Amino acid sequence: TIIQGELGTKLFLQNLLNQTSVCFDTETTGIDALNAELVGMSFSWQKGEAFYVPFPENNGEAQVLVDKFKPFFESETIEKIGWL
C-alpha cells in the first residue's frame, strides 16, 4: 500500500505508533550514506502486508515528512527491525 497525502500519512502514523514490532527499510538514491537522498521508507508489521511512504524531492518538504516519523523512531516501546 502506498501512503499518500497528509490524511493518509496521519492515519498511517497513528497505526504505526500502535505496533509493538515493525520492520522498516529506507529507499535512497544510492548506497553512499553521506551523499544519498531519501526517496521513501517502507514498513511492515504483518506477514504479507507492507506500506511504502514516498518522500518529496524537495529537501525542505522531505524534512517535514521525516520529522513526522520522529515519535516512531524515538519510541522505546516499539521494536524496530531494519532491513539491510
Can you annotate each of these PLM segments?
Residues 1-41, 55-72:
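Long, highly charged low-complexity segments
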Residues 23, 77-84:
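Acidic beta-strand-to-loop metal/phosphate-binding motif
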Residues 37, 47-49:
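Residue-level recognition of conserved structural "scaffold" positions that shape functional pockets
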Residues 42-47, 54-57, 80:
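Function-dense linear segments that define catalytic or interfacial modules
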